[in-house]
């Protein structure tokens, strides 16, 4: 199995309680499961203001969100190992973990896995797509040693 090279960007004032680069690489690799070659992605951890601005600009939603995924789009004839960018909002992840009574690192891992699957083309707009994506997220999270992230909803 190949590996995932992560360009980690910390753009939040409070770095206390953030996952390490090693953890993020482990979670992304578990989700992407690259075969052979190395693939690359950027993970940017931001505050609510940046998340809000990006969510409004790119999704038309006037609020911060937990994770935004920006897949790298490249012409078919060009082979680059770039998956794209994830933007994860520290405050939203912390708030959701608290509200859902989940361990904070488990929720961070889930956001990296969830966002990575979006970079691979998975989506959850339609019910059948959501079911497939959630099932895959559960398998990956359990493979990484975490509980089913959707257990409370079931």
Curated annotation (Swiss-Prot):
Localization (cell): Cytoplasm
Any idea what job this protein has? Single strand-specific metallo-endoribonuclease involved in late-stage 70S ribosome quality control and in maturation of the 3' terminus of the 16S rRNA.
A molecular function (GO) held by this record is: zinc ion binding
Binding note for cofactor: Binds 1 zinc ion.
Q: Name one GO cellular component term.
A: cytoplasm
Keyword check for Hydrolase? yes
- Name the family: Belongs to the endoribonuclease YbeY family.
Q: What class of enzyme is it?
A: hydrolase
Protein name as it appears in the record: Endoribonuclease YbeY
The protein's matches in NCBIfam families, at most eight in alphabetical order, are given as: rRNA maturation RNase YbeY (TIGR00043)
E.C. no: 3.1.-.-
Q: Which domain of life is it from?
A: Bacteria
Q: Which PROSITE patterns match?
A: UPF0054
Whether Cytoplasm counts among this entry's keywords is yes
Gene Ontology biological process terms in this record? rRNA processing
**Keywords on this record?**
Cytoplasm, Endonuclease, Hydrolase, Metal-binding, Nuclease, Ribosome biogenesis, rRNA processing, Zinc
Q: What organism is this sequence from?
A: Haemophilus influenzae (strain ATCC 51907 / DSM 11121 / KW20 / Rd)
Q: Where does Zn(2+) bind?
A: 114, 118, 124
* Listed cofactors: Zn(2+)
